[in-house]
């Protein structure tokens, strides 16, 4: 695409190369380590499900057992597979025996890696086939209904705490015109080191992410999608201490979109950086394999940092998220890189700065389904001004080709949206998307004008920052508080005790198979 902003492509290339080197350097650490969340994910992918007599999820029971025996460094797949060879049990039976205190995985007679892999192979393939079937179901539905929607996807949230009430609100929103339904997680779930089991009706500020809740909402949206003749995407959150587990649950239940950003968890949830960067890699490999779009959390930086002064940190983070995604085999078309309309309305020419930032993101990441967040920080409760702010936000999306459009609510900062609030917000967006549909193709920006100058300044600062990050490494960068003005220590935060260095002979057959398929797909099947 031709650049309206006349961006310096040498700086874009320099920034992208620096981000790639940061990701490569970090990947060396990632490849040498596993975590309790990664191993619980492997357990789930092996088909281990359910809870013990104390309602502890069986994946936690098995992994905690191996942690107690100081044996996690071999990987749960090795120990479960070894027990399968020796005892003739399937993974679920092995897990139940561990839960009942009947089996110590570390005392089972050891078998060769080849024997273990052979026992695991049909189980691994069955899980991968289930994930592929969900991906095909989505693709077949889209093909049967005229393909994907052109223009922005209208993204709406539900957050009642009760999955059954969420379904009522989600189906109503879909009928009103929503393209993506995001079920907000209950407050604090990102800090739980386990995933609750079953359907849930009590949450705070959101609803628990559980596999059963995923299934129920997917079923409801499929039904309304058939009625409406269009596919309704389902979004949830695989971030926090159970990042890859929730990615696997989403892959099993046919989710389409996942919030997934280690930096967000580090900065805003104080999750240990070593832990969550390892978890993120596996979660992104799963998302790629399942055809799930990830959304990243750069928009959150602007809730604590100034959107004018710190815009370059958003762009730098987008470059880093792109690089980390590619290392996990996640292609550009599944990278919903985030940013937000968060400049103070009192800033003169603030709209031009917003438009420049959004256009710059679109030009630098042309294939990415960019995730664009509405104004929240400067929504005051004045619903009339708020509706105007949202209209300006809608205009930027339309003019610059943003894709995942998180619909702003005029009642932001007052209460959780009513059905009527959503209706008015959808009507606002649809009017602007319709009446300005091709305006972006009709206009150019003034050479040397405010927007071109602004974009050039932000790109230059982001390129310089990425050069600095390359010298420091990602860990020290975060320790210094470069992102969002928030400092986090390398050995602090939640979850560090769940990080383990891999031992010789470690196996994770799912990561191996998914990465092989992901990289092959990214390279055009070669």
List the predicted regions and their residue ranges:
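Long, compositionally biased, glycine/small-hydrophobic-enriched stretches that function as flexible linkers
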Residues: 1-166, 172-177, 185-213, 240-246, ...
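Helix-rich catalytic cores of soluble enzyme domains
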Residues: 123-135, 145-150, 154-403, 410-418, ...
